[in-house]
Amino acid sequence: MEGSYILSTDVINEKVTRTSPGNYALGYVKDNKFIVQYVGRADKDVASRLKQHVGEKYKRFKFSYATSPKAAFEKECENYHDFGGTEGKVDNKIHPDRPVYANWKCPKCKIFG
């Protein structure tokens, strides 16, 4: 992922320049290390999705573009597990969901299988 950057509309406009599916992590920096508090994805436009978080408690973000909505879903699932979502270490309350039209499975835990 690219970043971390300050979570503001101006910075998102400057750094996230393509309309694309993608993934992101929200958090803060402590001792020069990015601390992940929330992971997410956008199936169509990662910049628009990030802007929905402006004004929340999160100070910074990292992001990456994805090649497809499915790739974004799979990466969000991996991030959720890698950053401790199942142990409550991130603010995500539930496992990432898939779009209603999709029959995708989580690459880590095979939920929805």
What do these predicted ranges mean?
Residues 1-36, 41-113:
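Boundary/linker segments flanking structured domains
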